[in-house]
Swiss-Prot record:
Gene Ontology molecular-function annotations: serine-type endopeptidase inhibitor activity
GO cellular component terms, semicolon-separated: extracellular region
Family: Belongs to the Bowman-Birk serine protease inhibitor family.
UniProt xrefs under PROSITE patterns: BOWMAN_BIRK
Name this protein carries in UniProt: Bowman-Birk type proteinase inhibitor
Coiled coil: none
Origin species: Phaseolus angularis (Azuki bean)
Lineage, broadest ranks: Eukaryota, Viridiplantae, Streptophyta, Embryophyta, Tracheophyta
Stretches for region Disordered: 1-24
Length: 82
C-alpha cells in the first residue's frame, strides 16, 4: 500500500490538500487529524478516507499526520468572513 499510480493529470488548485478544522495533540511529534466533512470524497493527499452511506456521502480523512494542511477557506478568498 506504499505506492500509488501516477496516471492522473496534474492536480488542479482545487484538489490541493487543505483542512479547515485540524486538531493536534501536544505530543512530540504532534498527532494531527483533520475533521472536515466533505461530500463524496476526501482531499487529494488523504490515504484513508471514510465515508457514510448517505447520498451524497459525507467523507472525512482518518489520516494522522504531524502537521496540518493549509486552511481551505483562506486560499480562495482571504477577505471574506474571517
Amino acid at each position: 500500500s506504499g505506492h500509488h499510480d501516477e496516471t492522473t493529470d496534474e492536480p488542479s488548485e482545487s484538489s490541493k490538500p487543505c483542512c479547515d478544522q485540524c486538531s493536534c495533540t501536544k505530543s512530540m511529534p504532534p498527532k494531527c487529524r483533520c475533521s472536515d466533512i466533505r461530500l463524496n470524497s476526501c482531499h487529494s493527499a488523504c490515504k484513508s478516507c471514510a465515508c457514510t452511506y448517505s447520498i451524497p456521502a459525507k467523507c472525512f480523512c482518518t489520516d494522522i499526520n504531524d502537521f496540518c494542511y493549509e486552511p481551505c477557506k483562506s486560499s480562495r478568498d482571504d477577505d471574506w468572513d474571517n
